[in-house]
Regions:
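Membrane-embedded beta-strands of outer-membrane beta-barrel proteins
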Residues: 66, 174, 231, 277, ...
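Transmembrane beta-barrel strands of outer-membrane/channel proteins
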Residues: 120, 248-254, 299-303, 405-409, ...
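Outer-membrane beta-barrel channels and translocator barrels
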Residues: 181, 211, 238-240, 272, ...
Length: 458
């Protein structure tokens, strides 16, 4: 296991230049002016992430313009100060994934030691982009009712989206504005999470407990999203903060409250358990390392165990048919040798191949009869197990350098009957899936130029 993780990490770093990536952060820009609308150059702009304590700084140019890009999502405190003006603090500025917010800052004349604090969100509308999208917060997704607590079906809350497999955990087949589902791009922390064999869905579905935000972009998106002409579904995972936080969860489903399928003679037994825990916070080792404001972790271990019984309805040969007696068939059987009908519609025992007799005995006897002529039914057990893990590390080297690494392995076990009447014919699928994203951000300013380096996504 350790070797597999190491190989994935090395591969992500070596092939970084070949791997495309989509933006998983946000940005702000704007103008600093005084009460007469005159621009204020050389004003110091500072953003502080409320959850992690990390700060981002810049200064306005000669035209009073400023911008800060590649900011991790979260809630910020924005401050602006300049000589001869009161310090302005904007609290509760929430930045979502792919946001690019314009914030106009107006400073009041006064002493720098004086401070003006503005409570509430400074900007609620994105005026910098014509992108049409819908955003869901991970906390809201946990509270909303959902079958199986799957993430991808939440895409159906966006206008213009339909699916013929709305509850599927991975193969969601979401059709956006009439475009085929194979034209969608599914992203996990900016790295592709796509079934490259046919692009019908995702190799793995993130656990809902790990999701910070889920943005579905359906139109007018920027050039960074270029793999498909449909929608871009961008899932951002949670990271640690300065406070230790976590969850312990268990969700149980069973057939007692389910309705019977109209075409089934009985209610199919089902029991499902989704349980696990998550924990995140600063990396802290007493007397060795204090990672507050610098190094954070987030870990999830989860299990999904489902037991159900599939209902099979089939037509099987009667006991008479198995011995060659087709007198109850209602139409004559003809001898292939002479073209004449068999006497009494009974095939002589000497004419029946013994291998065919052995094969016929493998069929079960009829135990049921419906209007469609089906005469056999049974419930066959099915096992669906999923082991989920998520590991994420964020480290801030400085205000200009930061790195994020996330590794999400998943293992699925499916065991089920494949053929009606033959209980010994079963299929056993063991499917591993892995997704890893690593990115390194370098922000530097020279004549208002900003750069970002993406290290890898796999």
């Amino acid at each position: 296991m350790k070797n597999a993780i190491l190989r994935l990490a090395v591969a992500g770093l070596l092939f970084a230049a070949l791997l495309p990536a989509q933006e998983v952060t946000a940005g702000i820009y704007g103008v600093v002016q005084d009460s007469t609308s005159a621009v204020v150059p050389n004003a110091a702009i500072k953003l502080r992430n409320v959850a992690t304590g990390r700060t981002h700084q810049t200064a306005t140019d000669e035209s009073g313009n400023y911008s800060l890009v590649f900011l991790p999502i979260g809630t910020y405190e924005v401050s602006a100060e300049a000589q001869g003006f009161k310090k302005l603090v904007l609290s509760d500025v929430t930045l979502r994934v792919n946001d690019n917010r314009r914030i106009l800052i107006t400073l009041e004349v006064g002493q720098l030691a004086e401070q003006v604090t503005v409570e509430g969100s400074a900007v609620t509308v994105n005026t910098a982009s014509g992108t049409t999208s819908q955003l869901l917060d991970g906390r809201d997704m946990i509270k909303l009712p959902s079958r199986g607590r799957n993430v991808l079906p939440f895409a159906l809350l966006m206008p213009g989206v339909v699916s013929d497999t709305p509850y599927d955990r991975r193969n969601n087949r979401a059709m956006v504005n009439g475009i085929r589902p194979t034209h969608n791009a599914w992203l996990l922390d900016g790295g592709y999470n796509i079934d490259t064999g046919g692009n019908w869905g995702t190799p793995l579905s993130p656990n809902i407990e790990t999701v910070a935000e889920f943005r579905a972009i359906r139109g007018n998106y920027s050039a960074e999203f270029g793999i498909g002409g449909g929608s871009q579904f961008n899932v951002i995972t949670k990271g640690g903060t300065n406070g230790l936080h976590g969850s312990l969860y268990w969700f149980h489903r069973n057939d007692k409250l389910n309705a019977r399928n109209f075409f089934s003679p009985r209610r199919e037994p089902f029991k499902g358990n989704d349980f696990g825990f998550s924990v995140g916070g600063p990396v802290y080792i007493p007397k060795v390392y204090d990672g507050r404001n610098k190094t954070f972790f987030f870990v999830l271990l989860g299990w999904i165990k489902e037991r159900r019984e599939q209902n099979f309805l089939q037509i099987v040969p009667t006991a008479a048919y198995k011995t060659g007696n087709f007198s109850g068939l209602g139409r004559p059987l003809f001898d292939p040798d002479n073209g004449m009908p068999f006497a009494g519609n009974v095939i002589p025992a000497a004419r029946i191949d013994r291998n065919a007799l052995g094969y016929a005995k493998m069929y079960p006897d009829p135990n049921f009869l419906d209007a469609a002529g089906r005469n056999w039914t049974t419930l066959a057990g099915r096992v669906d197990d999923t082991n989920e893990k998520n590991f994420r590390i964020d480290h801030n080297f400085s205000d200009k350098h930061r790195v994020m690494w996330r590794y999400t392995p998943e293992f699925r076990l499916n065991d089920f009957a494949t053929s009606s009447g033959f209980s010994f014919l079963r299929q056993n699928n063991q499917t591993p899936a892995r997704n890893m994203t690593a990115n390194y951000n370098l922000n530097y300013a020279r004549k208002s130029l900003r750069r970002r380096l993406f290290v890898g996504a796999a």
